[in-house]
Amino acid sequence: MGIIVPVLTLVFLLFAKVSHGASNPRVILVGGSVGSWKVPDSPNNTLNHWAENNRFKVGDFIVWKYDMKVDSVLQVTKEDYESCNTANPLKQYNDGNTKVALDKSGPYFFISGAPGNCAKGEKITLVVLAERKSGGGSSSGDAPKVSPVSPTAQTPAPAPGPAAAHNAAVGLKVASGWFLTAVVVGLAMA
């Protein structure tokens, strides 16, 4: 009987770890692929279409891969984003492999530092979701992927899809398996 409490405690801790696994920070490549940070091929194929179809969470990292000889990434205010003003960036990155921590909820505005590229559409707005403090709802642990072009420029991000439900189901099955194992071991030791 003395071993049941430590075993059940271990099972509880493992269950807590599995159920919180979806909240781990992700490293997300801008546009979903190398070479996406460029002037878009068409007005219907912008990085904002990609961003609108993905969810970003506090703690995630966003990564740009680009040729540092011809481009850079500028984090700017909303006003500078809308006017493509490169003169006063909040932050400037020009290393060709830029990694930015999304450390607060709300919008982030990024534009190209290459002359004229922002006006041609090389810019992106990322909206980072607020952290949920209570146990309500679940979050998707899936990394964003390239999505089909959105028919309108201002569509909301989609709800988590079947993959999120699948991840939750797998986590529940793993936790249930650990719990049953602990019960069997506990009964065998009694």
Swiss-Prot record:
Tissue expression: Confined to flowers and siliques. Expressed in female gametophytes.
One Gene Ontology cellular component: plasma membrane
Organism: Arabidopsis thaliana (Mouse-ear cress)
Disulfide bonds: C84-C118
Propeptide residue range(s): 168-190
Location in or out of the cell: Cell membrane
The keyword Magnesium is assigned to this record: no
SUPFAM superfamilies on file: Cupredoxins (SSF49503)
Sites of GPI-anchor amidated asparagine lipidation: N167
CDD domains: OsENODL1_like
Family: Belongs to the early nodulin-like (ENODL) family.
Lipoprotein in keyword set: yes
Disruption phenotype: No visible phenotype. Plants lacking ENODL11, ENODL12, ENODL13, ENODL14 and ENODL15 have a reduced seed set due to aborted ovules as a result of pollen tubes failling to rupture and release their sperm cell cargo.
Database matches in PANTHER family: BLUE COPPER PROTEIN (PTHR33021), EARLY NODULIN-LIKE PROTEIN 12 (PTHR33021:SF540)
Family matches, as Gene3D superfamilies: Cupredoxins - blue copper proteins
Name of the protein: Early nodulin-like protein 12
Glycosylation sites recorded in the entry for this protein: N44
Biased composition (Low complexity): 151-164
